[in-house]
Amino acid sequence: MTVHFIGAGPGAADLITVRGRDLIGRCPVCLYAGSIVSPELLRYCPPGARIVDTAPMSLDEIEAEYVKAEAEGLDVARLHSGDLSVWSAVAEQIRRLEKHGIAYTMTPGVPSFAAAASALGRELTIPAVAQSLVLTRVSGRASPMPNSETLSAFGATGSTLAIHLAIHALQQVVEELTPLYGADCPVAIVVKASWPDERVVRGTLGDIAAKVAEEPIERTALIFVGPGLEASDFRESSLYDPAYQRRFRGRGE
């Protein structure tokens, strides 16, 4: 018996990986967070599968589901939104599984920041403008941020910031980053990336709070901050330079 942790992607059901889809189809038990994982993914479950919405459940209750499935010899598909590597809360589940000696696998998914960048129609790394992307958040109810991991510390690098789980703290974002990036620095907020009701709010650190106040956003939003978001007059990379192609890629005769 194995618990398969599966990154279910940012929202749209057709953005799940082929491996993730196939694993769902092979598992007689499926656990998913109904509050953030698309119910359309459940159509990949095999007939008669036991489907459990973990949204209202505690970690102890989820652990009990794993133990029950292990006793029955049933593989479990455990769906988490986005990708498992960041803010998935799988670490504490894995610790519980290891306590019981239950095997597990991890299958990556399309992360929310990638879907949000697609919604913007932008590459996030622009030659000579922005070559680093920081994925971060602010302190919240689920867990505090380490003292050294502040918006100000990351903003001091000048990198493009992808700030997750922070729409409730937009004013804090503006206040901490404006002295570092300037009031005219581009900001883009992507709400429910890849979902049918996806929307984008664009502005600057100087006016984004007022724009959001006109159309309030409650949750499931990602805030991008950085000059690369609007850069158009930038140098081209050497990737397609003929000399680069000859040396590193090879060229057909």
Swiss-Prot record:
Superkingdom of source: Bacteria
Gene3D superfamilies reported in the protein's UniProt record: Cobalt-precorrin-4 Transmethylase, Domain 1, Methyltransferase, Cobalt-precorrin-4 Transmethylase, Domain 2
Enzyme Commission designation: 2.1.1.133
Stored Pfam families: TP_methylase
UniProt keywords, alphabetically: Cobalamin biosynthesis, Methyltransferase, S-adenosyl-L-methionine, Transferase
Entry-linked InterPro entries: 4pyrrol_Mease (IPR000878), 4pyrrol_Methylase_sf (IPR035996), 4pyrrole_Mease_sub1 (IPR014777), 4pyrrole_Mease_sub2 (IPR014776), Cbl_synth_CobM/CibF (IPR006362), Siro_Cobalamin_biosynth (IPR050161), Uropor_MeTrfase_CS (IPR003043)
A GO molecular function held by the record: precorrin-4 C11-methyltransferase activity
Biochemical pathway: Cofactor biosynthesis; adenosylcobalamin biosynthesis; cob(II)yrinate a,c-diamide from precorrin-2 (aerobic route): step 4/10
Reactions mediated catalytically: precorrin-4 + S-adenosyl-L-methionine = precorrin-5 + S-adenosyl-L-homocysteine
GO term, biological process aspect, one: methylation
Protein family according to the UniProt entry: Belongs to the precorrin methyltransferase family.
Name used for this protein in its record: Precorrin-4 C(11)-methyltransferase
